[in-house]
C-alpha cells in the first residue's frame, strides 16, 4: 500500500544570494510539481544559508517549528548606517569609526546579548495595519516598529578588520526566532555613536536543521528529493514518545489519551516508526497539537 505521506516532508535549502524566500518556494513548486510549498523564517535577498521549506503536508508542520532558535554568521560594518540596516539600503548617517576601541565594541556587544528588547528593522515583513512594513517604507512612509523581547544567546566576534574610516566585524550569533541580525548591527552602531549596518548574512542553523543538511537549488532541480520525510521531521524536532497501535489510531482521529506526566511537546510514534502527531499534556489530557497522519488520509 502506498504511503499517503510519501511526498510530504521538509526540504532544507541553502538559499543563494539575490533571491527572495518566495522565489525559492516558486522554484520548489516547479521542481516538486505541487502548489503546497511554504517556508519557515524569511531570509532577506542578500542573505544565504538555511531555509526550511515544507512540501505537501509538511507545510502544516512549519507552524510548529517557527519558534526554533536560529544561528547566523554575519559581517557588521561600523561607520555608517542605512535606512534598511543592511548594505542594500541608502546611507543615512555615520561617523568615522577609527577611534572606536575593541574594548568598547566588546562592551556594547555584551549589552546586546541575553534577553533584550529589540526594535525590528523597518524594512521587514512585519505587518502594520494590514500592510507589511517594507511596503510602507518603500512607499515613503516613516515606520517605527515597537521593540519586542528577543533572546541573543551568543554574539561572538570572529574577526575584526579596520579599513579606513570603517570597522568590519565578522560575528557569530545564536538567537531566538524573531531576532533581526540587521537590528543588532544597527543598535551596535548606534551605541558606539558611529552607525552600523549589515554587509553579509549567512544562516547556519534553524532549530535542529543545519548547513550540513542543506541542498543547493541546482541540485534539487536535478534531483527533487525531500531532505526529511514528515516522519523524520517530527522525530528530529521533538523528543519521541512511543505509542501503541491503538493509541496511534486514537491520536489520528484527534482523540486524547490519559496523561503521563510529560512536559513540553512530543512526537508520538507508532510501533512501525511512523510519526502520528505532536502531543502535549493539557490539564488531565494528553492531546494533539498537530496530527501528521489523520485518519482521513
Swiss-Prot record:
Gene: truB
Signal peptide span: none
Keyword tRNA processing: yes
Keywords: Isomerase, tRNA processing
Enzyme Commission code(s) on record: 5.4.99.25
Catalytic residues identified in the record: 44
Pfam families: TruB_C (PF09142), TruB_C_2 (PF16198), TruB_N (PF01509)
Record-annotated membrane-spanning stretches: none
Molecular functions per Gene Ontology: RNA binding; tRNA pseudouridine(55) synthase activity
Catalytic activity as recorded in UniProt: uridine(55) in tRNA = pseudouridine(55) in tRNA
Stored NCBIfam families: TruB (TIGR00431)
Protein name: tRNA pseudouridine synthase B
Job description of the protein: Responsible for synthesis of pseudouridine from uracil-55 in the psi GC loop of transfer RNAs.
UniProt xrefs under InterPro entries: PsdUridine_synth_cat_dom_sf, PsdUridine_synth_N, PUA-like_sf, PUA_sf, tRNA_psdUridine_synth_fam2_C, tRNA_psdUridine_synth_TruB, TruB_C
Taxonomic placement: Bacteria, Bacillati, Actinomycetota, Actinomycetes, Mycobacteriales
GO biological process assignments: mRNA pseudouridine synthesis; tRNA pseudouridine synthesis
Keyword tRNA processing: yes
SUPFAM superfamilies, sorted: Pseudouridine synthase, PUA domain-like
Similarity field: Belongs to the pseudouridine synthase TruB family. Type 1 subfamily.
Amino acid at each position: 500500500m502506498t504511503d499517503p505521506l510519501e511526498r510530504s516532508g521538509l526540504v532544507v535549502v541553502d538559499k543563494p544570494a539575490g533571491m527572495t524566500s518566495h522565489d525559492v518556494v516558486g522554484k520548489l513548486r516547479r521542481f516538486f510539481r505541487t502548489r503546497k510549498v511554504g517556508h519557515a523564517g524569511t531570509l532577506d535577498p542578500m542573505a544565504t544559508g538555511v531555509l526550511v521549506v515544507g512540501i505537501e503536508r509538511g507545510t502544516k508542520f512549519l507552524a510548529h517549528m517557527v519558534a526554533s532558535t536560529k544561528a547566523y554568521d554575519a559581517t557588521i560594518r561600523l561607520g555608517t548606517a542605512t535606512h534598511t540596516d543592511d548594505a542594500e539600503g541608502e546611507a543615512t548617517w555615520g561617523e568615522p569609526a577609527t577611534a572606536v576601541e575593541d574594548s568598547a565594541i566588546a562592551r556594547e556587544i555584551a549589552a546586546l546579548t541575553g534577553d533584550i528588547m529589540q526594535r525590528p528593522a523597518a524594512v521587514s515583513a512585519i505587518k502594520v495595519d494590514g500592510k507589511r512594513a517594507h511596503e510602507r517604507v518603500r512607499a515613503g512612509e516613516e515606520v517605527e516598529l515597537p521593540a519586542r523581547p528577543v533572546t541573543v544567546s551568543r554574539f561572538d566576534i570572529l574577526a575584526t578588520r579596520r579599513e579606513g574610516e570603517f570597522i568590519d566585524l565578522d560575528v557569530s550569533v545564536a538567537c531566538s526566532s524573531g531576532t533581526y541580525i540587521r537590528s543588532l548591527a544597527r543598535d551596535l552602531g548606534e551605541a558606539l555613536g558611529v552607525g552600523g549596518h549589515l554587509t553579509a548574512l549567512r544562516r547556519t542553523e534553524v532549530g535542529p536543521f543545519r548547513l550540513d543538511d542543506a541542498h543547493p537549488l541546482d541540485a534539487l532541480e536535478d534531483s527533487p528529493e525531500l531532505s526529511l520525510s514528515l516522519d523524520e521531521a517530527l522525530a528530529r524536532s521533538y523528543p519521541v514518545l512511543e505509542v501503541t497501535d491503538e493509541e496511534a489510531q486514537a491520536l489520528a482521529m484527534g482523540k486524547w489519551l490519559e496523561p503521563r506526566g510529560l512536559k513540553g511537546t512530543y512526537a508520538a510514534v507508532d510501533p512501525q516508526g511512523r510519526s502520528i502527531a505532536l502531543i502535549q499534556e493539557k490539564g488531565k489530557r494528553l492531546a494533539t497539537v498537530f496530527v501528521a497522519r489523520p485518519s482521513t488520509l
